[in-house]
């Protein structure tokens, strides 16, 4: 048995695909398998298995001249709210329609069951995304989209005055299961969490030990009994997904959480409040400190 403290870490992995792999491997506690070229194979695997929620931890933005897409295309994008964030700067020359979405949203928009983008500009979006994620966004090498002035990534960010709806931040958080039950209620955020279904805490990877968040209200002897019962269940042939049923809410869990600055501001508004539960309030205060270090305008004192 091991007692651990709450912990928050800002995940800043700039190379495309790296953050997706890291978040996905947290679910299985397989970060030890990360290598220089492991992310492509890992991401292909999660797409093939249908577990595309992990793709939500990276986000890409386009600046599209307002005359490029038809009204039908804009309506199709808005239909996917809140998966895409859309803003416009009609007072500038040129005027841009800014649209950002996580990689899962772009993948499902451009390769989903419905044909949502109706003309050749879809190829332009695919080509940009293909440069960063060739193993996700396939393109027709024989087609060369017309240059219609669409900007992508940092080039798009550089012409946008307000990135609060477009720029995302990712945190790796260690907290109790009580905490994770609360944070996942913030539905605009994206989550990848340590899976008690797949993690076998009786194994060597976990030092034959279950982590708990220390609580003065919980008797340590009770936790020892619970840990022993878990290990006994595994020894008797139970799968981790069965043995986990007896684990308490103070069991520690690692969760990776991603959201735009606007998403985090809404979270902080509710969770740094004195009336918020103590654990999530303290974690929210740490997140707020990290965001301030990035010079983000969070609008809170």
Regions found by a protein language model. Give the residues of each.
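Family-specific signature for flavin-dependent thymidylate synthase
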Residues: 1-301
